[in-house]
Amino acid sequence: RVSRGLGDVYKRQIMLNPVLFALLEKYLAKTETLEEQTLEEAIEEEKQIPVDICNHALLVGYGRVGSLLGEKLLASDIPLVVIETSRTRVDELRERGVRAVLGNAANEEIMQLAHLECAKWLILTIPNGYEAGEIVASARAKNPDIEIIARAHYDDEVTYITERGANQVVMGEREIARTMLELLETPPAGEVVTG
């Protein structure tokens, strides 16, 4: 009985395999086409960025760190173009009148749409230090005079990003420690209560 039951299972599997593989092929073909269409659509959409924008800040990533920086730059009236992978964030920025490009900054076409060649600053706030390093190297080759500031989480990322051409690399933990040391050097005016 058991062997007969297993035989039925194997027969069904053999019969279903061609169907499943055909469906998988169709899905993968649609996925590849969708990715190509997405890039083409993104390029078409980004044609709205004024061609004459130059000497601007190019901010890669508008998450927790990027949004804080972006708001300060906007408040200071510094011309800004944001590159962001989140469609929702890009739509929100555009609704506010902020120039935003949907895509990955590692893609040269996306950087062209954001006018890397004449940007004054490139600010990378993305959390992946190695991806940031590759973006830095590519940007430095295309715009040797650009000021590049990047974010890192680890010492090896700082080295990697710096070697690829960043002018400055900020590591969160170091900045927290530096600020705490500064606070120790200038204690508060009031009485300090300890446990």
Question: Residue spans of the language-model regions?
Answer:
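Single conserved hydrophobic/aromatic residue that forms the stacking wall/gate
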Residues: 1-6, 10
